[in-house]
Amino acid sequence: MFDRLESVAQKFRKLEEDLSNPELLANQKEYQKIAREHAEIAPIVEAYGLYKGLHRQLLDNQQLLEQETDPEMRELFRQEIAELKRQIEDTENGLKLMLAPRDPNDDKNVILEIRAGTGGEEAALFVSDLFRMYTRYAELRRWKVEILDSHQTGIGGLKEVIAAVNGQGAYSRLKFERGVHRVQRVPVTESQGRIHTSAVTVAVLPEAEEVDVYIDPNDLRVDVFRSSGPGGQSVNTTDSAVRVTHIPSGLVVICQDEKSQHKNKAKALKVLRARLLDQMQSEQEARIARDRKSQVGTGDRSERIRTYNFPQNRVSDHRINLTLYKLDIILGGALDEIIDPLSTHFQAEALRREE
């Protein structure tokens, strides 16, 4: 680990030299690339500097303890040494997490897909709740959310919503949300006060660039039709809705939120590209898992990952046995209280696999 840290520190010094070169300012694209790389490894270099400083203090205190004869002073040095060892261990664990393998998709934007599962109208209402939660979380992180497609129900719910989430670190944070989200609450239509359980599925796909996934236009079938609202009624007098079918994979994407056929097609292709990239990466992960004879990655996406219990104001994430009695705050967008421990957990898992 320490060889890697020395290498990172050396690279950091080289990047600082590059950034101080006035000629680099003439090439803004290269300057931004180097500045971004410099900012990414700066926390590692800072933590490594702290680690080395603590080690020097530990050696100094150990030498002073050997030389000291006064019992009270010796006890003070022992306490100082114990505290320094604790700080060194914490800093070393933090450095291990920082050096854990990084997901190559972490810097990408996101295609977020939320769909109602079991539970009928109640599940559709919870799709609306979850989308509102993610939208508020995005606002707190200054990300941009753009609805690509949605299908409303008659009482304000959503059968499905697909949105693009653009912003720094969007995939690195939201990737932990994919899976089945279960809700337990008394529906508005329930006269007996009984708690119902419904389920919603969340898919989080890294947005694919054209260089990531090439789509041959000959592999596409594009159909246009009139967009429809709740209940199936037509909401447009022109054929602006677009259905794109990728013939080799059988994937189908429908977009009808825009009044322009051209814009709907562009959005549909964005979603299709993300789904194809996700499919390719899932197949690759499955091959690796078969080779290792164990599941690799963040686990089966179809499993229940979280339960939202409204009567108890409780949210439980089953992957890390985390329970918080602040459901109202979480639904208000305070998702970092769940995502931070999830991120730490999966980083530690990735590091263990590397070792």
Swiss-Prot record:
PTM text: Methylated by PrmC. Methylation increases the termination efficiency of RF1.
SMART domains the record matches: PCRF (SM00937)
Subcellular location as annotated: Cytoplasm
Modification N5-methylglutamine, positions: 233
One example GO MF annotation: translation release factor activity, codon specific
Classification via PROSITE patterns: RF_PROK_I (PS00745)
Entry superkingdom: Bacteria
Keywords: Cytoplasm, Methylation, Protein biosynthesis
SUPFAM superfamilies, per the entry: Release factor (SSF75620)
InterPro entries in UniProt: PCRF, Pep_chain_release_fac_I, Pep_chain_release_fac_I_sf, Prokaryotic/Mito_RF, RF-1
Xref: Pfam families: PCRF, RF-1
Function, in words: Peptide chain release factor 1 directs the termination of translation in response to the peptide chain termination codons UAG and UAA.
Family according to the record: Belongs to the prokaryotic/mitochondrial release factor family.
Protein name per UniProt: Peptide chain release factor 1
Organism: Syntrophobacter fumaroxidans (strain DSM 10017 / MPOB)
